[in-house]
Amino acid sequence: MKRPDYRTLQALDAVIRERGFERAAQKLCITQSAVSQRIKQLENLFGQPLLVRTIPPRPTEQGQKLLALLHQVELLEEEWLGNETNSDIPLLLSLAVNADSLATWLLPALQSVLVDSPIRLNLQVEDETRTQERLRRGEVVGAVSIQSQPLPSCLVDKLGALDYLFVASPTFAARYFPNGVTRSALLRAPAVAFDHLDDMHQAFLQQNFDLSPGSVPCHIVNSSEAFVQLARQGTTCCMIPHLQIERELANNELVDLTPGLFQRRMLYWHRFAPESRMMRKVTDALLSHGHQVLRQS
């Protein structure tokens, strides 16, 4: 059985996390040549490349599996040894989360864990359709995703759903939709997407108004909070989680443009199995709060 030296795995992990050999060497307090030698040793052991040497480097499929193994071992070491050997160094937990969860329910869910437990969070923001890929690649140990099926050697639980409403300010609605939300009016109304892969707005319009993707003007803004600001100031219409804008809807700063029509995104919590004690705390906190504030039907 091939048993890697975990120093070599840590070198591989550092190259991926630090996005290059030079910064990985600085992180590990060794020379860049030593980093290269450790990775070459690991590649020789498995008889195949573990890194695609692009800028930044990325792991091969086998490299992803080894990184996932490393992160599981690190968490299980914490499970068995606790913090006896590194009592002054909080445990690092890398999680992949979608921006809308981060802007609404996720931080309140983790409050008790952050207060009571010696951990450092590394929250990697990614679209909920792609967070599971970060777990697959071994970049994180847990992910909030819309995927209901677990990866091999992983666990999954349902968190609940975010319901997205199509909203705008009253002034925007009066300007662009004086006769209601129609197909022709939507073609002129500026919208906003999180990035070029965010298709929620386009999917909503296609499903309900038969508008083809790319047919409406659309800003790109990488911030969930900015969606609310853009809508409130009357510059765009957009899809925003109801949970995020309850106050704005109640005081009429924003209006639901299509009452009864919405997009529902069911969210699931994925993590490696078996869970460490600390990850179990994170799981319990996320599930408990998620089941309280997210739609369960």
From Swiss-Prot:
DNA-binding region: 21-40
Protein name, per record: HTH-type transcriptional regulator ArgP
Functional note: Controls the transcription of genes involved in arginine and lysine metabolism.
HAMAP family on file: HTH_type_ArgP
Organism: Pectobacterium atrosepticum (strain SCRI 1043 / ATCC BAA-672) (Erwinia carotovora subsp. atroseptica)
Ranges for domain HTH lysR-type: 4-60
S-adenosyl-L-methionine keyword on record: no
Family membership: Belongs to the LysR transcriptional regulatory family.
